[in-house]
Every structure is written in C-alpha cells, then in structure tokens.
Amino acid sequence: MTDIFIYPQANLIAGVDEVGRGPLVGAVVTAAVILDPKRPIVGLADSKKLSEKRRLSLYDEITDKALSWSLGRAEPEEIDQLNILHATMLAMQRAVAGLHIAPDYVLIDGNRCPKLAMPSLAVVKGDSRVAEISAASILAKVTRDREMTELDLQFPEYGFAQHKGYPTAVHLEKLTTFGATEHHRRSFGPVKRVLGLV
C-alpha cells in the first residue's frame, strides 16, 4: 500500500467501494468488507491493478476470511431516477446495511460518504491505500464482471463480456446498430441519443 493511511481508533472497520459508475449498462455494484486481523490476506490492492486471475483468487480468499462482507447495488432504473451519484450512495448504504456485523467505523473510497448510522470517512485513492477498501473493490468488480458475462450470453451482439458496459468505440457502435436493451441506463447521453430522447 502506498501513501500510508492512518486508521481511525475503532475495533470493527468496514471498507466500501463501488464498481460501475461509468458504464452505459447494468447496475452499479458496491461491496462492504470487515477484515479479520487474525486472518490476514496478502496482496490486496486496487482491483483495477490486478489481473483477472488474481482478482478471482482474492475474491475467494476475502469471502472466506472476512469477518463480514456484503454486496449492494442500484439498478439502471434507480440510476436513471436518482442520477449516478445518488444511486451509488444508495448502493453503498445497502452494502453496509447488509453486513451481519455492524461496523464501528466505515471507510469509503472517493471523496464523499453516504449517510450512515456510524461514523465514516471518505478516503481518496482508498482502493490502493486501505486494505478493507481494496477488498471491497475486488468483491464489487468480480461481481459486476460476472454479471456482464451473464448479460453477454443474453445479448451476444453487444460484446458486454469484453467492455463490461463501458462506452468503448465497440459498445457505442453496437448501441447505434442494435439499439438499447432494457438493461441500458436511459439517462446516459449515448443511450439517450439512440432512444431519441435528446
């Protein structure tokens, strides 16, 4: 971990991160993780900096060794209704609420915190500075990537397994050719344009 982070004085600290704010399709997925200090996990890092194979291996280790972990999500309809920022905050609240052990303190990746029942702190670049947030980023990314692979089986013409729903040139081309699926976020510019909403 670079840029040493000074932990707050608390016994049970949860880390929270999200994946999927930028894509044009699918849910934004969040995870909350309370690690077990007696069962350390070696190699935790920002999920984006790990190979897929390493992420999958760490996913299994995190879900096995963590004191508690939980996933949260906000669906495309909620994103369209609330906007992506508020939907992400809602998904983070859901992840924390899903923990079977209530944390004393929550560390959140980024620069803002959702409203929570316990103290929280936003940590910029937290996914590479705080082990709990790194673990959450891995759970969220593996989960969302799996969902995109499943969506790819339903809609093979879009290439979701490759671009994970992000607005790549390939995705934008397929969107123009085939139109939007019911899983696309209608409030996002490229989807709006295809649907004739702008």
UniProtKB/Swiss-Prot annotation:
Reaction(s) catalysed by this chain's protein: Endonucleolytic cleavage to 5'-phosphomonoester
Single Gene Ontology MF annotation: RNA binding
Cofactor: Mn(2+); Mg(2+)
Main location: cytoplasm
Keyword line: Cytoplasm, Endonuclease, Hydrolase, Manganese, Metal-binding, Nuclease
EC nos: 3.1.26.4
Pfam families referenced in this protein's UniProt entry, alphabetically: RNase_HII
Co-factor binding details: Manganese or magnesium. Binds 1 divalent metal ion per monomer in the absence of substrate. May bind a second metal ion after substrate binding.
Designated name of the protein: Ribonuclease HII
InterPro entries associated with the record: RNase_HII, RNase_HII/HIII, RNase_HII/HIII_dom, RNaseH-like_sf, RNaseH_sf
Positions with a binding annotation for a divalent metal cation: 17-18, 109
GO cellular component: cytoplasm; ribonuclease H2 complex
CDD domains for this protein: RNase_HII_bacteria_HII_like
Family of the protein in this entry: Belongs to the RNase HII family.
GO biological process: DNA replication, removal of RNA primer; mismatch repair
RNase H type-2 domain sequence ranges: 11-198
Source organism, top-level taxon: Bacteria
Cited function: Endonuclease that specifically degrades the RNA of RNA-DNA hybrids.
Entry's localization field: Cytoplasm
